[in-house]
């Protein structure tokens, strides 16, 4: 970067940069040895959890056909963003903190910073897409399979990553973020400094575009999804009540217990419908966890541009790493899904070849009736059963016709 200052200022600036660079090069840690070791262990564990968990999620979706649904394509995109965070962003960030200096050059510094912004932006945009996907599934259940096919989902995923890359890499490569503060300019000239000292305009604009606008869209759409889900649940309960009352009236003049069989079938209907609402809760946990992890950082990122606050480096660092930790949480949340749990167990060889559940045996890519079930005992009521599948839903006697809300049930 060219310096347009006067010669005297130029010399002082060069001297300052040289001294700062020398001090950074030889000052390997700002923490004591014990604290540095503890931080290193914690950061290494976080990296391993992020990488292991998200590789497990991606492997499960790729390997098991029943997990290869439209919404799970978006889940794969989210896992890829978390995986990049664990492989690239977090390890370099850990080295920078522990060594208190940057050893990887200016190009990797910019690339690392842009990758950080890329992963966060791609994650929240993907969560927005998932919310829109669920809104279409619950409001237009019959048209949903044609509205969002796997091919269209691929286009959406590529678009999300393209927009995220444009938002992250272009401004950083063009140096639109550089602050005119002396400390920021000094760091920019120092090959051993990789602090992201942004100007106020970039800090506000990037926070709004990369976080606040997608967050508002996600919250609004997901609120509408919950409203629609509540309406459907009320309709289902009303239908169940009328059906139960009709069965009682029909059985009053009959001898024997013919109505008991109907009651048993009636008791099964809400389970499939409640399963969809459990899927909504799971998606809500994913979105809520992401918001709780990253919202404090982005609030502080905007606040410090309005009010100058001293000694803000440590709070920034803590909140930033809370955001990083979010990448390790999603695989744990997916364990709410029976199919994901079974897939994880099979990948990790934690169970036998067959795992019976609810009268079904889950073998690789197929679900089969277990021997204890009578032939045809479920075939009369159940069309195609996909535990937690996104692409279709079991329909029992006309109830709960909309497609399931997520495979992460």
Swiss-Prot record:
The keyword Glycosyltransferase does not apply. A lipid is attached at residue 349 (S-palmitoyl cysteine). Disulfide bonds join 109-194, 187-193. It is a multi-pass membrane protein. Glycans are attached at residues 3, 11, 20. SUPFAM superfamilies: Family A G protein-coupled receptor-like (SSF81321). InterPro entries: ADR_fam (IPR002233), GPCR_Rhodpsn (IPR000276), GPCR_Rhodpsn_7TM (IPR017452). It is found in: Cell membrane. Residues 62-74, 133-153, 224-282, 338-409 are cytoplasmic. One of its GO terms (cellular component) is plasma membrane. The chain crosses the membrane at residues 38-61, 75-98, 110-132, 154-177, 200-223, 283-306, 319-337. Highly expressed in the liver and red and white muscle, with lower levels of expression in the gills, heart, kidney and spleen. GO terms for molecular function: beta2-adrenergic receptor activity; norepinephrine binding. Lacks the regulatory protein kinase A phosphorylation sites within the G-protein binding domain that mediate desensitization and are present in mammalian homologs. Residues 1-37, 99-109, 178-199, 307-318 are extracellular. Keywords: Cell membrane, Disulfide bond, G-protein coupled receptor, Glycoprotein, Lipoprotein, Membrane, Palmitate, Receptor, Transducer, Transmembrane, Transmembrane helix. The keyword Iron does not apply. One of its GO terms (biological process) is activation of adenylate cyclase activity. Belongs to the G-protein coupled receptor 1 family. Adrenergic receptor subfamily. ADRB2 sub-subfamily. Beta-adrenergic receptors mediate the catecholamine-induced activation of adenylate cyclase through the action of G proteins. The beta-2-adrenergic receptor binds epinephrine with an approximately 30-fold greater affinity than it does norepinephrine. PANTHER family: ADRENERGIC RECEPTOR-RELATED G-PROTEIN COUPLED RECEPTOR (PTHR24248), BETA-2 ADRENERGIC RECEPTOR (PTHR24248:SF21). This is Beta-2 adrenergic receptor. It comes from Oncorhynchus mykiss.
């Amino acid at each position: 970067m060219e310096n347009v200052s006067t010669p005297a200022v130029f010399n002082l600036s060069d001297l300052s940069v040289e001294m700062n660079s020398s001090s950074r090069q030889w000052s390997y840690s700002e923490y004591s040895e014990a604290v540095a070791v503890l931080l290193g262990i914690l950061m290494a564990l976080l990296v391993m959890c992020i990488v292991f968990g998200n590789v497990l999620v991606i492997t499960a979706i790729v390997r098991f056909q029943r997990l290869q649904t439209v919404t799970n394509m978006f889940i794969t995109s989210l896992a890829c963003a978390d995986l990049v965070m664990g492989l690239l962003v977090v390890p370099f960030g850990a080295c920078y903190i522990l060594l208190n200096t940057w050893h990887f050059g200016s190009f990797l510094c910019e690339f690392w910073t842009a990758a950080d912004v890329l992963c966060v932006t791609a994650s929240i945009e993907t969560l927005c897409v998932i919310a829109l996907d669920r809104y279409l599934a619950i409001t237009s259940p019959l048209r949903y399979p044609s509205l969002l096919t796997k091919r269209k989902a691929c286009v959406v995923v590529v678009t999300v990553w393209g927009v995220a890359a444009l938002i992250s890499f272009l401004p950083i490569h063009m140096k639109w973020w550089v602050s005119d503060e002396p400390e920021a300019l000094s760091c920019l000239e120092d090959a051993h400094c990789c602090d992201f000292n942004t100007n106020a305009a970039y800090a506000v604009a990037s926070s709004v575009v990369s976080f606040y606008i997608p967050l508002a869209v996600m919250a609004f759409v997901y609120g509408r999804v919950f409203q629609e889900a509540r309406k459907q649940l009320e309709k289902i309960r009303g239908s169940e009540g009328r059906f139960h009352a009709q069965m009682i009236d029909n059985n009053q003049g009959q001898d024997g217990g013919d109505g008991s069989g109907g009651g048993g079938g009636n008791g099964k209907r809400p389970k499939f419908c409640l399963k969809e609402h459990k899927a909504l809760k799971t998606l809500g946990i994913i979105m809520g966890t992401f918001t709780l992890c990253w919202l404090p950082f982005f609030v502080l990122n905007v606040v410090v541009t309005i009010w100058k606050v001293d000694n803000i480096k440590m709070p920034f660092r803590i909140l930033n790493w809370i955001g990083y930790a979010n990448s390790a949480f999603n695989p744990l949340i997916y364990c709410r899904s029976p199919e994901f749990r079974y897939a994880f167990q099979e990948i990790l060889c934690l169970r036998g070849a067959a795992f019976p559940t609810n009268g079904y045996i889950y073998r690789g890519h197929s679900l089969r009736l277990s021997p204890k079930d009578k032939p045809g005992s479920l075939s009369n009521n159940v069309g195609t059963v996909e535990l937690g599948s996104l692409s279709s839903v079991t329909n029992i006697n006309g109830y709960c016709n909309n497609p399931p809300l997520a495979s992460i049930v």
